[in-house]
From Swiss-Prot:
This is Temporin-1Tr. The modification Leucine amide is found at L16. GO terms for biological process: defense response to bacterium; innate immune response. GO terms for cellular component: extracellular region. Antimicrobial peptide. It comes from Rana temporaria. It comes from the Eukaryota. Transmembrane segments: none annotated. The lineage of its organism: Eukaryota, Metazoa, Chordata, Craniata, Vertebrata. It is found in: Secreted.
Amino acid sequence: LVPFLGRTLGGLLARL
């Protein structure tokens, strides 16, 4: 999996 997807998911979770 590309790190971009993981980073996006992490950002979204952090936003919550």
